[in-house]
From Swiss-Prot:
Keywords: Cytoplasm, Glycolysis, Lyase, Magnesium, Metal-binding, Secreted. Its main location: cytoplasm. It comes from Nostoc punctiforme (strain ATCC 29133 / PCC 73102). This is Enolase. Belongs to the enolase family.
């Protein structure tokens, strides 16, 4: 048997490392009999949905304020590794199902979704390297050639920044570019111009968790006005070449059945009208988490009102969970889903959720988390699944830029076969 074909798992290792916010996370290694080693790091969110898979933390206040992950590391070494040794790394579903069964809980709270996901991703990387093919080809096959439109978070608010802005993310979307390389350049130029615009107005240009600027602004509309001004000043046409997108993260300011923004409570119908006004006034193509994760009735109303005009993305609403997505499909709530690997906790379940979305004409947006690492798996995942969209932060901070640079390399590898989703109308509406 050749070196590359002996893909049995020989050893599994894990360690506690730091993410981009200086908080602990897991790094996992999967060693194969052929000498190949797959390495993966697990991200962590700041604004998390109530129905996400459980991220296991130590709770020991004497280490990292209780945020340590030594328990999850121990679970990889003592609970998962002994049961996975000898299994074929190329059988991703068997590996993932085995880990899910060992955990035995409905939300991976026994061993930790962070423990399971680390091994899941490391095994996939080892499998790809064993076959001497890139991860996007390993996961997506010969049709994996669609480069995603980036939704670039350039103004941070909400839980991602220490400022007074209600909405969590204000994004620029280079829909009019003809290639990913061009789209990235457009985004970088608008980002640099936005820095100048903020500076000219005496606003701070410090950045939030995801690399976007985090100034104190009078309202959400002011943030949108600044983006439109930066797009124009950079030499691009708002809405035609570079559009806007929002992550409202409404669950973060939902209290007692009301949406509290601009310092005042508003009824759901009133808030939906407000979002509609923003869509009418600005070149917005996508709104994420426009309502609370359990406000299903209002989600239906929002989708009826704005679903034909803009992309309505469920993040906290769906948490990359096929069961919750199925409910959304049946109730006609949202028309797109945000995909975060650590929300569900395994590669297999992530791919199943994307497949369910695709079969029901629900668009998928592959996403990072606010606590990231240098791991670039989501770039490959976006191409592998032909999702057509990716969220991986701003145009600064190396843990964000690493994903963009990986997509540049993939585009170069594909050569003439590479297709940019924005150029063929497969980005956000």
């Amino acid at each position: 048997m050749s070196k590359f074909l002996d893909t049995a798992i020989e050893a599994i290792a894990a360690r506690e490392i730091l993410d981009s916010r200086g908080r602990p996370t897991i790094e996992a290694e999967v060693h194969l009999a052929n000498g190949v080693v797959g390495l993966a790091q697990v991200p962590s969110g700041a604004s998390t949905g109530s129905f996400e898979a459980h991220e296991l933390r130590d709770g020991d206040k004497s280490r990292y304020g209780g945020k340590g992950v030594l328990k999850a590391v121990k679970n990889v070494k003592e609970a998962l590794a002994p049961k996975l040794l000898g299994l074929d790394a190329l059988n991703q579903e068997l590996l993932d199902r085995t880990m899910i069964a060992i955990d035995g809980s409905p939300n991976k709270s026994s061993l930790g979704a962070n423990a399971i996901l680390g091994v899941s991703l490391a095994a996939a990387k080892a499998g790809a390297e064993s076959l001497d093919i890139p991860l996007y080809r390993y996961l997506g096959g010969p049709l994996a050639n669609l480069l995603p439109v980036p939704l670039m978070n350039v103004i941070n608010g909400g839980a991602h920044a220490s400022n007074n802005v209600d909405f969590q993310e204000f994004m620029i979307v280079p829909i009019g570019a003809t290639s990913f390389r061009e789209a990235l350049r457009w985004g970088a130029e608008v980002f640099a111009t936005l820095s100048q615009v903020l500076d000219e107005k005496g606003l701070l240009t410090g950045v939030g968790d995801e690399g976007g600027f985090a100034p104190n602004l009078e309202s959400n509309q002011v943030a949108l006005e600044l983006l439109v001004a930066a797009i124009k000043k950079a030499g691009y046409k708002p809405g035609e070449e570079v559009a806007l997108a929002l992550d409202v993260a409404a669950s973060e300011f939902y209290k007692n059945g009301q949406y509290v923004y601009d310092g005042k409570p508003h009824a759901p119908a009133e808030f939906i009208d407000y979002l509609g006004q923003l869509v009418d006034q600005y070149p917005i193509v996508s709104i994420e988490d426009g309502l609370h994760e359990e406000d299903w009735q209002s989600w239906q109303l929002l989708t009826q009102k704005l679903g034909s005009q803009v992309q309505l993305v469920g993040d906290d609403l769906f948490v990359t969970n096929a069961t919750r997505l199925q409910r959304g499909i049946e109730e006609k709530a949202a028309n797109a889903i945000l995909i975060k690997l650590n929300q569900i906790g395994s590669l297999t379940e992530t791919l199943e959720t994307i497949d369910l979305a695709t079969r029901n004409s629900i668009r998928s947006v592959i996403s990072h988390r606010s606590g990231e690492t240098e791991d670039t798996t989501i770039a490959d995942l976006a191409v592998a699944t032909r999702a057509g969209q990716i969220k991986t932060g701003s145009l600064c901070r190396s843990e964000r830029v690493a994903k963009y640079n990986r997509l540049l390399r993939i585009e170069d590898e594909l050569g003439d076969r590479a297709v940019y989703a924005g150029a063929v109308g497969l980005g956000p509406k």
